[in-house]
A protein has these predicted regions:
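Juxtamembrane intracellular "pre-TM" segments in multi-pass secondary transporters
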Residues: 4-12, 220-254
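Short amphipathic helix-loop junctions that connect adjacent transmembrane helices
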Residues: 36-60, 270-288
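Conserved small/polar residues in nucleotide/adenosyl-binding loops
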Residues: 308-313
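C-terminal ends and interior cores of transmembrane alpha-helices
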Residues: 103-117
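Hydrophobic core of transmembrane alpha-helices in multi-pass small-molecule transporters
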Residues: 121-136
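Glycine-rich segments within core transmembrane alpha-helices of 12-TM secondary carriers
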Residues: 159-176
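Transmembrane alpha-helices of Major Facilitator/SLC transporters
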Residues: 292-307
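Pair of pore-lining "gating" transmembrane helices in MFS-fold secondary transporters
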Residues: 13-45, 251-267
Length: 319
């Protein structure tokens, strides 16, 4: 893949553009797989004839299964993120870790094409790896923001990244909606095949468009060798951060509150679509598919409008 040590100065348009472009690349995962199409495929087609499955000699309800697997994935992320962040800070090379999660997540999205009830164990492994890849890459992606921008640019660049993510994900979801509704025109025999292809497209989109970001984002300290005790050094970096946090009770309370709020919110967002598929009477399966996807599309469009109509910090200061 393309790679180079960036020559772009901090705050440059090229560097900022490369950073925001990754939002365009990876946001299709959160919309197409987490929110829109995969929940329909999982509830409406994978578990069309049954509400439970046998895994390791245990009968598990389909809703309990996906909720538990998603929660388990977030626990892994909660453990790995601070440790890997400490390792990245120690080595001074965020890009290599970001690449690892991007490749793992995008390739796992390709694996979701073969998500079937008969192979539910390996299918769920792809689901977990895709979710970890998505959130793991965001740890390093977000940490780049203060490296490539000046403080006065941070809010504007962050908002631009969100906007790019919304526009990119909505664009692909529209393509997928057309492909699913008119599957015969695209050579598919059923909606199911069109849905499965949409998962693979997400993987290709994510992996392909992220290369532009990798090409221009700073690589870090090229000459730093990775020591044998790098894991221990990662824990040492965490210990330093922990001491800083413990020095302020207010900061500690804020982080605990944010942790509970953030993970609770993410859990609700991930399960909301499965609730919509199971509990809302949409009519026929095709009407259910179109209705849920269009509903999520409208939510995304509202978010885009809010991003472009909300006052900037500069406007607020003037008022």
């Amino acid at each position: 893949m393309f790679n180079k040590k960036t020559d772009h100065p901090r705050g440059s348009k090229k560097l900022i553009g490369a950073w925001t472009w990754y939002d365009w690349a990876n946001s299709v995962y959160s919309l197409v797989i987490s929110s829109a199409i995969f929940p329909i495929y999982y509830s409406q087609y994978i578990f069309a004839q049954t509400n439970s499955v046998i895994i390791f000699n245990l009968e598990i309800n389909k809703d309990t299964l996906i909720s538990s697997v998603s929660g388990f994935s977030f626990l892994i992320i909660a453990f790995l993120s601070p440790l890997l962040s400490g390792i990245a800070d120690y080595t001074g090379n965020k890009k290599i870790f970001m690449k690892f999660f991007v490749y793992m997540g995008s390739i796992s999205c390709l694996g979701l094409y073969w998500f079937e009830l008969e192979t539910i164990e390996i299918s769920l492994v792809f689901y977990v790896l895709a979710l970890i890849g998505y959130w793991g890459s965001l740890v390093y992606y977000n940490s780049y923001l203060t490296d490539i921008t000046y403080p006065k640019q941070t809010n504007m660049v962050s908002a631009r990244g969100f906007a790019m993510g919304y526009i990119g994900s909505v664009s692909l979801l529209l393509v997928n909606l057309i492909m699913i509704n008119y599957y015969e025109s695209f050579g598919f025999t059923s909606e199911i095949n069109a849905m499965k292809l949409s998962f693979a497209i997400v993987g290709v989109w994510w992996l392909g468009f992220s290369q532009y970001s990798f090409y221009h984002l700073p690589k870090g300290n090229k000459g730093v060798k990775i020591p044998k005790n790098i894991i221990w050094n990662g824990f040492r970096e965490l210990k330093k951060v922990y001491k800083v946090i413990r020095s302020s009770k207010r900061f500690t309370r804020f982080l605990l509150a944010f942790f509970v709020f953030s993970f609770s919110l993410q859990t609700v967002l991930y399960i909301a679509s499965y609730f919509g598929v199971s509990e809302i009477e949409w009519g026929s399966p095709s009407e259910q598919t179109s209705g849920l996807i269009i509903s999520i599309l409208l939510i995304q469009l509202v978010a885009i409008c809010l991003l472009y109509t909300s006052p900037s910090p500069r406007d607020l200061r003037k008022s």
